[in-house]
Amino acid sequence: MSFVGLHIHSDYSLLDGASQLPALIDRAIELGMPAIALTDHGVMYGAVELLKVCRGKPIKPIIGNEMYVINGDIEINKRHRRFHQVVLAKNNQGYRNLVKLTTISNLKGIQGSGIFARPCINKELLEQYKEGLIVTSACLGGEVPQAILKGDLDHARQVAKWYKNLFGDDYYLEIQDHGSVEDRLVNINLVKIAQELDIKIVATNDSHFISCNDVEAHDALLCIQTGKLITEEKRLRYSGTEYLKSAEEMHLLFRDHLPDDIIETAIANTLEVADKVEAYSILGEPRIPHYPIPPNHTPETYVEDIAWDGLLERLKCRERADITPVYKERLEYELRMLEKMGFCTYFLVVWDYIKYARDHGIPVGPGRGSAAGSLVAYCMKITNIDPVHHGLIFERFLNPERKSMPDVDTDFCIDRRDEMIEYVTQKYGEDKVAQIITFNRMTSKAVLKDVARVLDIPYAESDKMAKMIPVSRGKPAKLKVMISDQTPEPQFKARYDNEPWVKKWIDMAIRIEGTNKTFGVHAAGVVISSEPLDQIVPLQKNNDGAVITQYYMEDVEAMGLLKMDFLGLKNLTTLQRAVELVAETKGIELDLDDLPLQERKALQIRARTGSKKLPDDVKKTHKLLEAGDLEGIFQLESQGMKQIVRDLKPSGIEDISSILALYRPGPLDAGLIPIFINRKHGREEISYQHKLLEPILNETYGVLVYQEQIMKMAQDLADYSLGEADLLRRAMGKKKAEEMQKHRAKFVDGSTKHGVPSRIAENLFDQMVKFAEYCLSFGTEILTVEYGPLPIGKIVSEEINCSVYSVDPEGRVYTQAIAQWHDRGEQEVLEYELEDGSVIRATSDHRFLTTDYQLLAIEEIFARQLDLLTLENIKQTEEALDNHRLPFPLLDAGTIKMVKVIGRRSLGVQRIFDIGLPQDHNFLLANGAIAANCFNKSHSTAYAYVTYQTAYLKANYPVEYMAALLTASSDSQEKVEKYRENCQKMGITVEPPDINRSQRHFTPLGEAILFGLSAVRNLGEGAIEQIITARDNSEEKRFKSLADFCTQVDLRVVNRRAIETLIMAGAFDGVQSNRNQLLHDLELVIAWAQKRAKEKETGQLNIFDSLTAGESIKAKEAANNGFEQEPSAPPVAEFSLQEKLQLEKEHLGFYVSEHPLKSVQRSARLLSPINLVDLDQYKVRQKVSAVAILVAVKKIITKKNGQPMAFLTLEDMSGQSEAVVFPSNYERLQDVLIEGSQQMIWGKVDRRDDQYQLIVEDLEPVEEVKMVMLDLTPQEIANTSTQARLKQILQSHAPQKEQMKIPVVACINEGPTKHFIRFGENYWVNDYGTAVASLQELGFRARLEPLLPQSQSVG
């Protein structure tokens, strides 16, 4: 006999259910269940996932909800008794009613507060939405069982009768047996009531975990939820029988108190319930919202009118007859396609909210992704990119030969994104708009610590174990891997194997690893519906009160709902802020959208006239790009890109677009970048395999760069329609042999008809195929949002709908759904070993992200010994990584480190796979490596527009742009320092914060920039607003003293810590220069100010406080000073310079008073140290010296031979640079590798990943550096005999390889003047004393001299 589980909780019963749906369904099938119901507590989070997981499997999904029912008004939050009630959807109508009830309970029926809050309904709602529902009496928490337990059988009958009357045969009494006395009592009486009222009984097991082996782990989960220890007696605990039971196990229950025939019937009735449930048809066609159309219009005619009017405006034509045929025909074609595919209303919805943004001054991006290929979108000002001019293809956006929803993602200013959500909410109705939920799962590190806490294991112990788990590039290793023979950390496994208590702890954690812990909100997605959402998806409120769906993004889209991505981007905020500052300081109104058009116009004029002149603003922009001054320039900031841009010398947006596609993910080998550059500058001949290719490839100098070029080749050479060409592009991705053969034959046949020799046509087709031929092997695991790590071969072969993690151009991690699944046939696969112990299995040309954000072929990374980007400690469980487009940079999402590829081996020919993505074309593997795939021209052109806008503003309005950039970077001290250094190079001074002048943002002051308060640590928005408001409201519009400040501001908002930070950052220097004194005064001043504030509140004012504002301020001050002196502590000395500098660096990220190396640099000039920022001016392997502070020291153990080495971050007065100490020198130098120390460094210039660094050969604390000083006359210098003797002595004291090298300097006395000559390194010596003694013995005036004068301290 079979059995159907009708009372099942998954991990969507957050921190109560431990069953993940895929494993749960697999186990149910294994147990022979023909169906299964999902009844999570009060929510329907997993309903659509349940349908997806069960699809194609021999099990029927039943959507349900274990709801909470009260007797009373659900909108009045009283201490109502809450009763459990299992509600199942019998059919589509039942699903709709269940959605309605779930939504009402979550939006209006929350009873209780905090962790005790529950979403509730009442019987009136059940009466209203009863149709299509099956209801059971639930567990011991149900109203009927509760009445029985209280001994009130009459009330129990009454309640059961009410449900029977309402639901008829769709009401069942539910018996459970978890071994308690209460279960037996309730079951016996339920059977009696059932017989009396003719109600059927169903047997259930209240399942919260899958296996009986999960009991302890589930108990730990409950303790994590409630914050209790497992050892505590008074806490929530289950019986341990709440697992998924088989039919056989169910038959063994109830026998001690119920007859066999009752048990048999109750189990059989579970099948009856399952049979009643019809297949749901809730996943459906697109539900595009209704857009209000003006009278006498249809959506089609309205779009047509807007588009034509927009095109006339764009092209500056008066009549349609004036429009050139290429635009006219393209627009007519696109409008026909939109009408045919039914997407005109969709375009109106997007047009409307973008129009609202533009009309209200909300910055909007120029376009994103393939939408930039639509002329209709350009005409309607949805995008600002002319697809005709740029050769973009509509079919990359919408293909009539494969109907799918368009996807127009829109970038808005991050500060005003919420306004856009509010607008569409008001436009379409609160009941039709919602944001989207996300779920945060428990990763190995997090679950290990959580379980440790409930087991009362000390934090230090759990932290130590958690730190052993490698989290390289995105995902902590699973605990099962950590205890396996393939463990990346043997010590972790050894403790698991040898310490029983550690084994118990880890085994418990393994059982709940990966379960849902909390929910969050999708950072971009907004759902807009044509009908009330509560008829389609269950809704709830987020913690901030916003309405969100209970289904995550992919499930919402599967329902046919329109999901819009409202992306909040800092970059747009920076641009808008810069434009506003230009208007304020220069009185010039700039139109960002017009800047690329003005460049295009200037280039067209130059091409037409043959003139070499360009307008000054365009010329400045191009010069900035050529110079490689690219800090703060969108997409071009990496070291590698800077060099490429310098070499390329872009002459327009087209060049920028091409280089973005070449450098970032794309189809080309890295070696094609030099070819592209050389062809542009005429150093290499541009050649085409056939003349028909010239118009397609001429803008990229004959180099195949974009997917669109493949489509055009198919169209122009082989007579494909663009729709067919898009299918060809997709087919090349899937690489199915039969399909590819058909396309090959068609392409070659069509090409030969156009006079292309078949040999060339075959070659071209092969080139196009190779365009997408970098792939991963079957077993390579990709990190998916829904299921964790999955083999790419499984994802592709089963076309699993899931999302992956990607990195956007601003370095932020977000999620996006897989759009295409590519089986690329067979090819050689190599296994690349990383120094952290993980491996990557891929074709040699698959691209991965390096530490300076280059995407390079893995083989090149290995060959050049470059570093892969590594992300550690991703905050996935803290409502972060699962969110679409995270509101923080990659650097803040986790800890970046470098990992080398240390080995490789061939795995032979294997089947290979890849995936297609709608936005940024990269994704995280399960071991965290960031892999890449193809790039399209629409995407890179859209990026190129923003790149040009940022370059234009920096070149023409540098102070305003850098002020805006610093403001946008206020939340990152590292970025503030980076851009401040760039300001310094540009001759722009960034002045320190000033309590009387600084605003919230960085502000231009002539040719300088005043530090913004938002970038000072420990100052929240409230404190900043309070300071500025108090200052503006004061009589003198300034603070006269620390005491004046403390009396003017609300000290509850601007707390002591904030004031201390302002003092240490130098913000009070304008009122009192002794920072140490201010810190000593602060406690007294705060107490005094608080006392005055209290007296003011109670009316106990000093008589002089009552003087009117019109009276003499001096008289008032004199009076108050006479009677109530501002307090101060006994005088103290000011901090030393080094102490002040250290505090400035800590609180601002840079030095204000002066750089700590200023005096050191002056003394060290004898040794000719270089500026770190000038490393790229020296030859690779050239020996140099530098004076620098060790900002960061990261010591590692090499995996290859277990030897220690170190990576350093150095800083001098010019900026920062990286350095490395290899094992050969590490042991000798390790004692002086101290963070914060000032060192004299000797080493060689190195270039890795197109970034220059130092290979350290020697270093010494600057205060310990000594020189051998030789006093010589000009005659002695000129004497060849003297030279020979000097050479002989110095070389006799030459240091061996491992010895310290001591500089030798000659002081040339020429009368009253002296000058110094530093001997070359070949003449440096190995020992101070013996070298000086030898020189003195031969009559030379030699002495030992410290680098720094004795009076000079480095603190």
From Swiss-Prot:
SUPFAM superfamilies in alphabetical order: Hedgehog/intein (Hint) domain, PHP domain-like
Subcellular location per the Swiss-Prot or TrEMBL entry: Cytoplasm
Cellular component, GO annotation: cytoplasm
Keyword annotations of the record: Autocatalytic cleavage, Cytoplasm, DNA replication, DNA-directed DNA polymerase, Nucleotidyltransferase, Protein splicing, Transferase
Signal peptide range: none
Keyword Nucleotidyltransferase belongs to the record: yes
Pfam families in the record: DNA_pol3_alpha, DNA_pol3_finger, HHH_6, PHP, tRNA_anti-codon
Gene Ontology biological process terms in this record: DNA replication; intein-mediated protein splicing
Statement: the UniProt record of this protein carries the keyword Transferase: yes
Chief location bin: cytoplasm
Enzyme Commission number(s) from the entry: 2.7.7.7
Modification after translation, per record: This protein undergoes a protein self splicing that involves a post-translational excision of the intervening region (intein) followed by peptide ligation.
Gene3D superfamilies, alphabetized: 1.10.150.870, Bacterial DNA polymerase III alpha subunit, thumb domain (1.10.10.1600), Hedgehog/Intein (Hint) domain (2.170.16.10), Metal-dependent hydrolases (3.20.20.140)
Catalytic reaction list: DNA(n) + a 2'-deoxyribonucleoside 5'-triphosphate = DNA(n+1) + diphosphate
GO MF, one annotated term: 3'-5' exonuclease activity
Annotated function: DNA polymerase III is a complex, multichain enzyme responsible for most of the replicative synthesis in bacteria. This DNA polymerase also exhibits 3' to 5' exonuclease activity. The alpha chain is the DNA polymerase.
Complex and partners: DNA polymerase III contains a core (composed of alpha, epsilon and theta chains) that associates with a tau subunit. This core dimerizes to form the PolIII' complex. PolIII' associates with the gamma complex (composed of gamma, delta, delta', psi and chi chains) and with the beta chain to form the complete DNA polymerase III complex.
More info: The intein is a split intein capable of protein trans-splicing. The N- and C-terminal halves of dnaE are encoded by two separate genes located 745 kb apart in the genome and on opposite DNA strands. The dnaE-N product consists of a N-extein sequence followed by a 123-aa intein sequence (Ssp dnaE1), whereas the dnaE-C product consists of a 36-aa intein sequence (Ssp dnaE2) followed by a C-extein sequence. The N- and C-extein sequences together reconstitute a complete DnaE sequence that is interrupted by the intein sequences inside the beta- and tau-binding domains.
Family listed: Belongs to the DNA polymerase type-C family. DnaE subfamily.
Protein name: DNA polymerase III subunit alpha
Species whose genome carries this gene: Synechocystis sp. (strain ATCC 27184 / PCC 6803 / Kazusa)
Species classification: Bacteria, Bacillati, Cyanobacteriota, Cyanophyceae, Synechococcales
